[in-house]
């Protein structure tokens, strides 16, 4: 791990599957460009289903980790604890159906950031004492970026959930440019986005917009 602080404000999530029209090299290049556009965190969310050989996935993860390090961006691995350990990533992010936070913490140690996804109020309550370093709450709005996404929380219930929270929070799910102002006013530490950046004509402009909204109201 090289990044000792975690700025959650512009949290980018993607894998090669988010650029299905591209070759693996093309997808990797597009992700690298977005990493260098001003994001603060990059989460390598790549389930490995599109590779002929798993060593291709490791190679791409290593390339994107290097890009992240050079850009001063925290590199976090989604779900795959062994990959996070092999890469000595800055962090690991897990969901409610993965191994428990305590078990993952035993494997990765105290030096690696550990994020946990939360989809409803009772999960948020339990997460407070789980040992996670930060939480990803969502989906806030309906989203097409994740096939197995839970029911949208909505801005009203999200506000109520945040009143009971003591941990750094990243909002995720269906975030568009039109929703940035609404989201910036409720006390989130960052916004996690996929399509808002992968489909942007100017990722740098979008990343700057997110950061300005979050830091202005943070």
Swiss-Prot record:
Report a single Gene Ontology molecular function: thiamine-phosphate diphosphorylase activity
- HAMAP family with a match to the protein in the record: TMP_synthase
Task: Relate the protein's function as given in its record.
Answer: Condenses 4-methyl-5-(beta-hydroxyethyl)thiazole monophosphate (THZ-P) and 2-methyl-4-amino-5-hydroxymethyl pyrimidine pyrophosphate (HMP-PP) to form thiamine monophosphate (TMP).
Its annotated pathway reads: Cofactor biosynthesis; thiamine diphosphate biosynthesis; thiamine phosphate from 4-amino-2-methyl-5-diphosphomethylpyrimidine and 4-methyl-5-(2-phosphoethyl)-thiazole: step 1/1
The GO cellular component terms are: cytoplasm
Annotated EC: 2.5.1.3
Protein name in the entry: Thiamine-phosphate synthase
Say which species the protein is native to.
Answer: Lactococcus lactis subsp. cremoris (strain SK11)
Binding-site positions, 4-amino-2-methyl-5-(diphosphooxymethyl)pyrimidine: 43-47, 78, 117, 146
- Report residues binding Mg(2+): 79, 98
């Amino acid at each position: 791990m090289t990044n000792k602080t975690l700025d959650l404000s512009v949290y980018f999530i993607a894998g090669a599957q988010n650029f299905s029209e591209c070759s693996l090299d093309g997808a990797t290049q597009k992700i690298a460009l977005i990493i260098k556009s001003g994001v603060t965190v990059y989460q390598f969310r790549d389930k490995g289903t599109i590779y002929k050989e798993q060593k291709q996935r490791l190679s791409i993860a290593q390339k994107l980790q290097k890009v992240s390090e050079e850009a001063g961006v925290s590199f976090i691995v989604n779900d795959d604890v062994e990959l996070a350990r092999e890469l000595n990533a800055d962090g690991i992010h897990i969901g409610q159906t993965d191994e428990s936070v305590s078990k993952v913490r035993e494997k990765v140690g105290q030096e690696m950031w550990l994020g946990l996804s939360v989809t409803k109020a009772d999960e948020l309550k339990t997460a407070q004492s789980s040992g996670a370093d930060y939480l990803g709450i969502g989906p806030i709005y309906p989203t097409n970026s994740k096939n197995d996404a839970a029911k949208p929380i909505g801005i009203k219930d999200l506000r109520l959930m945040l009143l009971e929270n003591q941990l750094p929070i990243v909002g995720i799910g269906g975030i568009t440019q039109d929703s940035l102002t609404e989201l910036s006013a409720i006390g989130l530490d960052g916004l996690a986005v996929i399509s808002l950046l992968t489909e942007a004509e100017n990722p740098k402009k979008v990343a700057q917009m997110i950061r300005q909204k979050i830091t202005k109201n943070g």
